[in-house]
From Swiss-Prot:
Coiled coil: none annotated. This is LPS-assembly protein LptD. It is found in: Cell outer membrane. Keywords: Cell outer membrane, Membrane, Signal.
Length: 757
C-alpha cells in the first residue's frame, strides 16, 4: 500500500529554477523542434499536492526513519517541494548532514529543467545538487544534451563532459561537445570550454572557448560564420563576434580570412540615445597579396543623427575607401559595386512655423576616371514662407555657397542667390489652379584658369508659371466589378527669358531626369548654375481606377512639353545649340495591379521627331507573399554617357515548402550580348539548422589596372564566387536571408510599383 510521509526538513529552493528565464528561440524558416515533455510515468501515478514553504513532501511505497536523523524511502519515491519534484526508486534524507541522496534512476523536473540520471546528491546547506550520467532538457528552450556530471546551483547549471543541441533524434544534426558548459540564469547565455562542434557526429571545429545566447535577447558572443569562395579573393571565412556593451550600445568585430589576399578586420560600433543615434564602421586589410602597389585597403563609414531641440537637428553621413577598386573587390553595405561616387554630408537644420534654415557641407569621393565634382564648404540656406492668406502666399529663399574642387586646375567659386516669390492657389473639389511669379538673382565670384569663365557674374531672371488641373471622377463597371475612375487633365505655362550663362562654371548642376510628374517642374536643371530658357506649354492627363474599398488598381499618365520658342540654355557649351525645335518627347507611364498577386509597371519617353525611344522600363511581378515573388524587367536608354543601354533581368525568391527556398537574379546586356550579373541561392531549413548556398557571376570593374590588372587583351573579366553559410538555431543570431541577398546584389531588388493601397 502506498504510504505518504511528511518531514519537517528545511530545504532551500531547488537550483533548477536557474533556468526559469530561458526563452524559446525560433529556428530559421518558421520551424521549431519539439521537445518531449515529462509524462505521468516519469513521476508516478500519484496526485502531487503543494506543501508548506520550507518542508519536503515525500511519497513512497515503504519508508524507514531512524531517530529523526535519517529517512530511507524505496519504491516509487517522489520528493516534492513547491512545485519541484524528484522521482526515484531509492532516496535517503540525512537531516544531520543536510543531504538528500537518490539512486536507481532519477528524474528531476521543476517546469523549466527536466533531468534523468543514475543518481543525485543534494547538499541542503550549500544549495547544490549533483546528478550523475544524466540527460537534460531545457523545456522552455529547445535544447537538450547529456552530461556525465550535472551540477545545479541557484544561478547556474554546470555541465561536465557534456553535449548541447537543439536538434531531435539520437544522432542530432549538430551538437556541441565540451569539457565544461555553464548555463547562466542572470545573463541568459551559455559558455563552453574545450568544445568541439560536430555535424552529424563528425567533428568540424575545435573551440577552446565559446559562448552562445539562449534566447532572442542580444548577447555577447559569436555570430554565424560565413564561408565564401571567389575568383577574386579565393577561399573566404568570416567569423563575427558580437559585444552587447549596454542596452543602447553594441559592437561587432569580424576577422575575414581570404586565401588570396590575407586577413581583413571589420568592426562596427552602434549607439542609441534619447535624442541621438549613430554608428561607426571600419574595414582594414594591411597587406593585399594580390596587388603590386597600394597594398593597404580600408573603408570607414560614420553616421550620426541628433535632435538638439524641438527646432534644431544635426545629421552626418560619410564614407571613404582607400582606392577605386575597393567596392569591386570587397563589396559594402554602404555603397554598391557599380557606384561611381561616395557621398558625404554634414548638415545642421532649423525648422519652425515660417522659417527653415540649413547649414551644410557636402563632398564626393569619385570612384573611377570621372569629372571631379565640387565640395560645398559650406552652404547656408534660409527660407521664409508667410503661409496662406486667402489663397495668396509669399516666400523668400536665400542661399550662400562656397565651392571648392579637388582638382587644383579648375575653378573655385562663391555663389549668392536670392529668390523672392509670390504664389496664388485656388482650390475647388473639381479643379485647382496655381500661379507663381519669381525673381531669381544670382551673384558669382569665380576663380578659374578657363578663359571662358568670368571672375564676377550677376544673373537676374524673372520666372512666371501658371498651372491648372481638373479633378473628374465617375462610377464604372468592368465585368462584375464596380470601380471609381478618376481623370485629371492638367496644363501648365512656364516662361523664363534667355540669358547666356556659359561664363558661369558648373558646380552643382545637372540635367534632371524626366518622368510624367517631372514634365510640370519649373526647372530643367538641378542646382542654380543653369536656369533654362522656357516659353512652353505642358499638357498631360492622368487616370486611376479604385476599387470599392479604395484600393488603387490602375494608374496611367501621358504628357508632353510644347516649346513655343527654342530653348537655347545648355549645360555645357559643347552641347547641342537647342533642346528641340518644337515638341519634347512624349512621356507615359502605367501602374497596374492586375490582381492580388500580379503587377505591371511600364514607362517610356518617346521622341516623335526622331521616331526613337529615349528611355523605357517595364517590370512584371508576381508576388504570392513576402517570401514568394518573381519579377521580370526590361529597360532601354539611349545616349547615356554616349552609350546605349538595353538590358533584361529577372529576380525571384520562392519557397517550395517549409524547408526549401531558392532565390536568383539574372541581368543580361542585350547591347553587348553578355551576362552582366547573376546570382542563385538555395536554402534548406530544418527545425534546428539551415544551410544556405549561393553562387554569383558579375563583371569585374577594374578601375586601377596599374595595380591589379583584370583586363586581358581588352576583354571584360568576370568575378565568380560561391558562398556557404551553416545556420544553427540556439547558438547565435542570423539577420541575413535570401531576400537580403537580392537587395545587396549589384542590381538590387526594388519593388517598382507605386499604387496607393
Amino acid at each position: 500500500m502506498l504510504q505518504r510521509f511528511i518531514t519537517s526538513l528545511m530545504l532551500l529552493p531547488f537550483p533548477g529554477s536557474a533556468l526559469a528565464a530561458l526563452q524559446n528561440q525560433d529556428a530559421p524558416q518558421h520551424m521549431t523542434c519539439t521537445v518531449a515533455q515529462p509524462t505521468e510515468s516519469m513521476i508516478g501515478a500519484v496526485q502531487l499536492q503543494k506543501t508548506e514553504a520550507g518542508t519536503i513532501g515525500v511519497e513512497s511505497r515503504s519508508a524507514e526513519i531512524l531517530a529523526n536523523e535519517k529517512a530511507y524511502f524505496t519504491g516509487n519515491v517522489i520528493i516534492q517541494r513547491n512545485g519541484q519534484w524528484l522521482s526515484t526508486s531509492k532516496a535517503t534524507i540525512d537531516q544531520q548532514r543536510g543531504e538528500i541522496l537518490a539512486s536507481d534512476g532519477i528524474t528531476f523536473n521543476d517546469g523549466y529543467l527536466s533531468v534523468t540520471g543514475d543518481s543525485l546528491s543534494l547538499d541542503l546547506n550549500d544549495d547544490q545538487a549533483k546528478l550523475y550520467n544524466s540527460d537534460y532538457r531545457l523545456q522552455n528552450h529547445n535544447a537538450r544534451g547529456h552530461a556525465e556530471l550535472l551540477s545545479l546551483s541557484r544561478q547556474e547549471v554546470l555541465l561536465q563532459d557534456s553535449s548541447f543541441t537543439t536538434c531531435p533524434g539520437e544522432t542530432p544534426a549538430w551538437q556541441l561537445r565540451a569539457e565544461r558548459i555553464e548555463i547562466n540564469e542572470t545573463s541568459d547565455f551559455g559558455e563552453a570550454w574545450h568544445a568541439r562542434f560536430e555535424l552529424f557526429d563528425v567533428p568540424v571545429l575545435y573551440l577552446p572557448y565559446f559562448n552562445f545566447p539562449l534566447s532572442d535577447a542580444r548577447k555577447t558572443g559569436l555570430l554565424y560564420p560565413t564561408f565564401d569562395s571567389s575568383s577574386n579573393s579565393g577561399f573566404e571565412v568570416e567569423v563575427p563576434y558580437y559585444f552587447n556593451i549596454a542596452p543602447n550600445m553594441d559592437a561587432t568585430i569580424a576577422p575575414v580570412y581570404m586565401s588570396e589576399r590575407g586577413t581583413m578586420m571589420k568592426g562596427e560600433y552602434r549607439y542609441l540615445f534619447e535624442q541621438n543615434a549613430g554608428q561607426f564602421n571600419l574595414e582594414y586589410l594591411g597587406n593585399d597579396d594580390t596587388r603590386i602597389a597600394n597594398k593597404k585597403r580600408y573603408l570607414w563609414h560614420v553616421q550620426h543623427s541628433a535632435q538638439i531641440n524641438q527646432d534644431l537637428s544635426f545629421y552626418l553621413d560619410a564614407t571613404e575607401i582607400s582606392d577605386d577598386n575597393y567596392l569591386n573587390d570587397f563589396g559594402s553595405d554602404f555603397a554598391g559595386r557599380a557606384d561611381t561616387h561616395l557621398y558625404r554630408v554634414a548638415q545642421l537644420d532649423y525648422d519652425n512655423e515660417n522659417w527653415t534654415a540649413q547649414l551644410r557641407t557636402e563632398d564626393y569621393e569619385l570612384i573611377g576616371d570621372y569629372r571631379s565634382p565640387y565640395r560645398t564648404l559650406p552652404q547656408l540656406s534660409i527660407d521664409y514662407n508667410t503661409g496662406d492668406f486667402t489663397g495668396f502666399s509669399a516666400s523668400l529663399y536665400n542661399e550662400l555657397t562656397y565651392f571648392q574642387n579637388q582638382d587644383q586646375t579648375r575653378e573655385y567659386a562663391t555663389r549668392a542667390h536670392i529668390e523672392p516669390s509670390i504664389q496664388y492657389r485656388f482650390e475647388k473639389p473639381a479643379f485647382d489652379t496655381e500661379a507663381e511669379l519669381s525673381y531669381l538673382y544670382t551673384r558669382y565670384w569665380q576663380e578659374s584658369p578657363d578663359a571662358n569663365i568670368t571672375e564676377e557674374v550677376t544673373r537676374t531672371l524673372p520666372r512666371a508659371r501658371v498651372r491648372a488641373r481638373l479633378h473628374l471622377e465617375r462610377a464604372i463597371e468592368l465585368g462584375d466589378s464596380q470601380y471609381r475612375q478618376t481623370l485629371s487633365p492638367q496644363i501648365q505655362y512656364l516662361y523664363v527669358p534667355y540669358e547666356n550663362q556659359q561664363n558661369i562654371g558648373i558646380y552643382d548642376t545637372s540635367l534632371l531626369q524626366d518622368d510624367y510628374h517631372g514634365l510640370f517642374r519649373s526647372r530643367r536643371f538641378s542646382g542654380l548654375d543653369r536656369i533654362a530658357e522656357a516659353n512652353q506649354i505642358t499638357y498631360g492627363v492622368s487616370s486611376s481606377l479604385f476599387t470599392q474599398n479604395e484600393r488603387e488598381v490602375l494608374r496611367a499618365s501621358i504628357g508632353q512639353i510644347y516649346n513655343i520658342n527654342d530653348s537655347r540654355t545648355q549645360l555645357f557649351a559643347s552641347d547641342e545649340e537647342t533642346t528641340t525645335s518644337s515638341n519634347s518627347e512624349w512621356v507615359a507611364d502605367i501602374n497596374w495591379a492586375v490582381d492580388e498577386n500580379w503587377s505591371i509597371r511600364s514607362s517610356i519617353q518617346y521622341d516623335t521627331e526622331l521616331n526613337t525611344t529615349r528611355k523605357s522600363q517595364t517590370a512584371v511581378e508576381f508576388r504570392k507573399d513576402e517570401s514568394n515573388l518573381i519579377q521580370v524587367s526590361h529597360r532601354t536608354a539611349t545616349n547615356i554617357l554616349n552609350n546605349d543601354i538595353e538590358q533584361v533581368g529577372t529576380q525571384a525568391v520562392w519557397s517550395a515548402n517549409s524547408r526549401w527556398q531558392v532565390a536568383s537574379n539574372v541581368f543580361y546586356d542585350l547591347t553587348h550580348d553578355r551576362l552582366n550579373d547573376a546570382m542563385v541561392g538555395i536554402q534548406y531549413s530544418s527545425c534546428c539548422w539551415a544551410l544556405r548556398v549561393s553562387a554569383y557571376r558579375r563583371i569585374n570593374r577594374d578601375l586601377e589596372p596599374a595595380f591589379s590588372a583584370t583586363q586581358i587583351n581588352g576583354e571584360t573579366q568576370f568575378d565568380n564566387g560561391i558562398s556557404i553559410q551553416f545556420i544553427i538555431s540556439g547558438l547565435a543570431s542570423d539577420s541575413s536571408g535570401l531576400i537580403n541577398m537580392l537587395e545587396k546584389s549589384t542590381y538590387g531588388y526594388r519593388r517598382p510599383f507605386y499604387l496607393s493601397n
